[in-house]
């Protein structure tokens, strides 16, 4: 059986990266929440 997690830096950045978050309204809400919580890292 193949493992489901096959890491790829590019895929990770495209789906969970800062620019991907900024592209949608909800993504911006995610960033706002993480800023409010005081997260050291906002996105992948």
Swiss-Prot record:
Basic residues composition bias: residue spans: 31-44
Domain of life: Bacteria
GO cellular component, one term: ribonucleoprotein complex
Region of interest called Disordered, as start-end residue ranges on this chain: 23-44
GO biological process assignments: translation
Keywords from the UniProt entry: Ribonucleoprotein, Ribosomal protein
Coiled-coil residues: none
Recorded GO MF terms: structural constituent of ribosome
InterPro entries: Ribosomal_bL34 (IPR000271), Ribosomal_bL34_CS (IPR020939)
Cross-referenced NCBIfam families: rpmH_bact
Family assignment from sequence similarity: Belongs to the bacterial ribosomal protein bL34 family.
The protein's name: Large ribosomal subunit protein bL34
Lineage, uppermost ranks: Bacteria, Pseudomonadati, Pseudomonadota, Gammaproteobacteria, Pasteurellales
Gene name linked to the record: rpmH
């Amino acid at each position: 059986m193949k493992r489901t997690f096959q890491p790829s830096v590019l895929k990770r950045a495209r789906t969970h990266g800062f620019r991907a978050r900024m592209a949608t309204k909800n993504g911006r809400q995610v960033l706002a929440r993480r800023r409010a919580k005081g997260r050291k890292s906002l996105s992948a």
